[in-house]
């Protein structure tokens, strides 16, 4: 059984049989770790062991983040994939801290702040909008690209999408129409691609917090197990 499957099974055990607080922590960790797959990243065994201590209540989330930071600072034997694992470990711990809170600042500033918090200690440009145009080739589009917004228009575009969503009323619409509307909002926000890196993970975390805040019970399974599918669906939805 590969390491990825083993990680999922361990967290599933907590979710099935653990105390309520342990279930919640395990579900959040599962989501945070699963989201790293959108960039082909995998967490280390050390992160998994440290996450378990947090789930068991032995340490708090800030201690987790400090332990992960110290682990990589003090590591004497470097491995080829250490940089990628370090990113995955730190970002997973950061996302876990964010998703452990029930509050969200549903604004452009709040969205940008999520990027800063998710990538704190990882990217120098965390919390900064890109100041150049980007294109990305996508294998799912046979090497073609999605059209990302010009950098000059980024702030205005985020403002517009969030204000449109803020003005929308979910009252009286069917479940299917709710899903369509939410999908359109999340997809549109992602297409702006305001950051140099980390757009999918930032958008996913922001969406989870927002949906919780308006009373939706968010099933984290999509992000925990199928984050690569989530990203590819966003790419396809924005392909013209």
Feature locations, PLM:
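FIC/Doc superfamily catalytic core
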Residues: 1-240
């Amino acid at each position: 059984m590969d390491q990825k499957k083993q990680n999922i099974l361990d967290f599933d055990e907590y979710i099935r049989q653990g105390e309520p607080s342990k279930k919640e922590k395990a579900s959040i960790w599962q989501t945070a770790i699963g989201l790293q797959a959108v960039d082909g990243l995998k967490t280390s065994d050390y992160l998994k062991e440290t996450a378990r201590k947090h789930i068991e209540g032995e340490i708090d989330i800030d201690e987790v983040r400090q332990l992960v930071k110290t682990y990589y600072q003090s590591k004497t034997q470097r491995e080829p994939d250490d940089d990628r694992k370090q990113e995955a470990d730190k970002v997973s711990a950061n996302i876990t801290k964010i998703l452990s809170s029930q509050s969200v600042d549903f604004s452009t500033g709040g969205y940008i702040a999520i990027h800063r918090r998710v990538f704190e200690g990882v990217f120098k440009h965390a919390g900064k909008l890109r100041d150049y145009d980007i294109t990305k080739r996508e294998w799912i589009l046979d090497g073609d690209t999605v059209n990302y917004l010009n950098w000059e228009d980024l702030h205005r575009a985020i403002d517009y999408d969030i204000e449109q969503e803020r003005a929308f009323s979910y009252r009286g619409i069917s479940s299917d129409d709710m899903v369509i509307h939410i999908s359109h909002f999340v997809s549109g926000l992602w297409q702006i691609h305001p950051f140099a890196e980390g757009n999918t993970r930032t958008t996913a975390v922001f969406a989870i917090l927002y949906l919780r805040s308006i009373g939706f019970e968010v099933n984290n399974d999509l992000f925990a197990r199928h984050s690569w599918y989530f990203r590819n669906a966003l790419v396809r939805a924005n392909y013209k």
